[in-house]
Curated annotation (Swiss-Prot):
PANTHER family: EXOCYST COMPLEX COMPONENT SEC15B, SEC15. Component of the exocyst complex involved in the docking of exocytic vesicles with fusion sites on the plasma membrane during regulated or polarized secretion. Involved in polarized cell growth and organ morphogenesis. During cytokinesis, involved in cell plate initiation, cell plate maturation and formation of new primary cell wall. It comes from Arabidopsis thaliana. Pfam families: EXOC6_Sec15_N, Sec15_C. The exocyst complex is composed of SEC3, SEC5, SEC6, SEC8, SEC10, EXO70A1 and EXO84B. Interacts with EXO84B. Binds to EXO70H1 AND EXO70B2. Binds directly to B1L. Keywords: Cell wall, Cytoplasm, Cytoskeleton, Exocytosis, Secreted, Transport. This is Exocyst complex component SEC15B. Belongs to the SEC15 family.
Amino acid sequence: MQSSKGRRKVGSTTAGAGIDSAEKLDELLISSAICNGEDLGPFVRKTFGTGKPETLLHHLKFFARSKESEIEEVCKAHYQDFIHAVDDLKSLLSDVESLKSALSDSNSKLQSVAAPLLSSLDSLVEAQTVSKNVDLAIGAVTHCVRVMELVSRANQHLQSGNFYMALKCVDSIESDFMEKTPSSTLKRMLENRIPAIRSYVERKVNKEFGDWLVEIRVVSRNLGQLAIGEASAARQREEELRIKQRQAEEQSRLSLRDCVYALNEEEDDEFGSGHEGSDGGSSGGGLLGFDLTPLYRAYHIHQTLSLGDTFKQYYYNNRDLQLTSDFQIAGFFIVEDRVLRTGGGLISKLEVETLWDTAVTKMCAVLEDQFSRMQTANHLLLIKDYVSLLGVSLRRYGYAVDSLLEVLSKHRDKYHELLLSDCRKQITEALSADKFEQMLMKKEYEYSMNVLSFQLQTSEIVPAFPFIAPFSTTVPDCCRIVRSFIEDSVSFMSHGGQLDFYDVVKKYLDRLLGEVLDEALLKLISTSVHGVSQAMQVAANMAVFERACDFFFRHAAHLSGVPLRMAERGRRHFPLTKSQNTAEDTLSGMLKKKIDGFMTLLENVNWTSDDIPQGGNEYMNEVLIYLETLVSTAQQILPAKVLKRVLRDVLAHISEKIVGTLCGDLVKRLSMAAIKGLDVDIQLLDSFTENLTPLLTDKEAREMKKAFVEIRQMINLLLSSHPENFVNPVIRERSYNALDYRKVATVSEKFRDPSDSIFGTFGTRGSRQNPKNKSLDALIKRLKDVS
């Protein structure tokens, strides 16, 4: 209990000390805030918040008592200075009184002296007023004189037609003089006459502008013709330059001569550059031959009259009416281009584009309608050329012509269909006039026109004249038609906005050759070829057409601006393959019919004879005579490769005919002598083939002999000592691969020795059988088993 009481006493002592220190801290804070001029609001709020305002009052009183001693010390320090200042003020009172009396005396003297001066000043002011009135009168008179001078000058300008200067005078009078004019009469006159003068000037320039609108219609027509003509001449120069370039490239490729290069100087003309002089006064002259001075004068006058926007709209409306009524497209828009660039804002680019869009829409509609009605390719080409020239002419002035070119491109297929139809008629007429005779050329120009121009020559050496060509007149006639088609197609495709159009030209050229010319030739072969000579001539023509087709594609590539290597890379097969094969098949068929006539002599052959014909059978001699005659004639017309194919077919037909005869009912039995006679016949065919050495190489001669390999192997089999070897697969593949086992069985049965038959065995019973016959019997038996 004692210890707890002791702790309480210590605690109360500590709390009392804490309260004293807190009060001292508050006094210090308040003193510091007052000294520093800080706000005492927080202290007041805190004090009232605790409910003890007497503490704050106690602190403030304590602070005031602490500052009283300081105030007393300050007063004691400055007491003597206050006393001295009061003494100084008392000493100044006497000086002030003396100064006041001196000022009063000076004022009296000044008033006495200034009285005469005031009267003089009044006189001066009166004189100045009179002078000012006189000056005003002189100024008014001078003003009126200047106004009258301007009026006189305006009248002179009006009389001389210098309306702009007259309006400038009127504007000067109105803005600078009329409000200041002192004469009411003169002012009323000016107010009445100035609007009349402006109205007069407006009427005069509107009349001049109306005359210009009438004149520019004729000028636009002539200007358009001149522009189109210039574009056409420029295109012609480009074509001539391209032709020279192609010739130079060809000569360089062939190394015929050294190439000579030169600069081609061309004068820059009005149309070529599309930019004229910048003289805004004449705005027309030069090569174009039209004057915009009346237009610009009217525009300038209306701007001076503050009617510029009205005149712009008036001009645009009139030009729009002229465009829809006259439709002079080229000249109209050349004029508008000049006005746009030199008119000083008379017409905006947007307005020109609006007029151009209107014209393009109308032209596209007209072209669509006209193209849909046209049934002649030449008419469509003429329209296309004119439209493309129009596009070239106006493109130089920055007009967009893509819509027009799209219309032309859209009718590309129709144009080519019409062109194909025209060429079909021309080719049909050319083929119907063909006499199937070799073409005779008497002069060198005929050779150049019919052979060299289409690169049909097989040698660079010019032949002697008269020259008989291996082809008939239909070949150059058809070549001219095809060349014209190519040139017309290129003409339509060029200058149309499409740079690479060779593929399009090639596509339609393929159609012309593959559909039109090929079908026409097929029809000619099927309806008009009735003899070997005619068939041979057609086959010869087809070989020449093969060279001509190479020229056609090269010519199309040249005209299209495509390098030959690229054109050769995209080449396809010969487009006249059908008619070429048909012509050769027709010739082969006719020759086979001729051969069949000679092969009927096989009926006269004694197939059971024991005598071998030393010079061959009659039918073979006749066939060889005909073949030799045929070759001697065909060599002059047919190319070697065509003649080889035809001869191979004929020889194969001879072989088939002989084998067919051996297998047929005509031959009942074959003797060894008959087989050896056939061997002689085949040897004659071998000799004939070998005699074709100038025409054939050794390899080709061996290939030619394969045409009658069937009859050769048949004879070799029948003459062999062991015909049974035929059934040996290895031997058959090596020596008898062209033989059919059924034919072998039939011929072997006929070739069997009659002594080996059933009735022949009675006379030879007990004798030994011939080994060859035994082998043949075994072959026949084996073949029967197979069948």
